[in-house]
Amino acid sequence: MNKGKLFVISAPSGAGKTTILGRVMANVGRLNFSISHTTRTARPGEQDGVDYHFVEQEDFIEMQEKGIFLESAYVHKNYYGTSREAVMAQLSEGVDVVLDIDVQGATILMESASLPATYIFIAPPDLSVLEERLRKRGSDSEETIKLRMGNAAGEMLSSRKYDYLIVNDDLAQASTLLKSIIWAERAKSRRTPAGLPIKLVVE
């Protein structure tokens, strides 16, 4: 069985990544979302085990020390990590996996080179648009918004390390671009847009 492909997607907070991923995940088959662990508080509407695995900091650090995470990072005063076992199990079954992780976590994966992946960065048109989106979201304090904006400039520069850059100035277009990238990468690994292996007849 062909192994699945890993898609690593990063963006500054407020760039629209979650909305874009929601649209794409609903329309692309054989594509699973890897649910990260985090120590941050759940936002309104978020569900444990669906959006994130919400854990206490001491539990996260214990998991970190046991080597449970494929990557982990401390971002915006909270810990985030990706379960190694969960990702590898899905890839071994031929299912493509999406990792929604920050630039720190993505850089760890890039530098380790332990797992082939396609890296995609989603950016806002500019930082003023990003700040406007963060304020409209209404879930962050003024201190948190300033922290996220302070980190955003550096995150945008890191987009140069990624294989693809999507600028989200139009939600529908950005969603279509992400879907097209996934289909193109599947074709490179001899899969149909639906993610199924292509059977070639050799005479």
Curated annotation (Swiss-Prot):
Entries under Gene3D superfamilies matching the protein: Guanylate Kinase phosphate binding domain, P-loop containing nucleotide triphosphate hydrolases
Binding site for ATP: 11-18
GO molecular function, one term: guanylate kinase activity
EC number: 2.7.4.8
Subcellular location: Cytoplasm
Family of this protein: Belongs to the guanylate kinase family.
SUPFAM superfamilies: P-loop containing nucleoside triphosphate hydrolases
Chain coiled-coil ranges: none
SMART domains in the cross-refs: GuKc
PROSITE patterns: GUANYLATE_KINASE_1 (PS00856), GUANYLATE_KINASE_2 (PS50052)
Domain Guanylate kinase-like: 4-183
Domain of life: Bacteria
HAMAP family: Guanylate_kinase
Name the record gives this protein: Guanylate kinase
Pfam families: Guanylate_kin
Catalyzed reaction equations: GMP + ATP = GDP + ADP
Function: Essential for recycling GMP and indirectly, cGMP.
Keyword Disulfide bond: no
One GO CC annotation: cytosol
Source organism of this protein record: Desulfotalea psychrophila (strain LSv54 / DSM 12343)
Keywords from the named record: ATP-binding, Cytoplasm, Kinase, Nucleotide-binding, Transferase
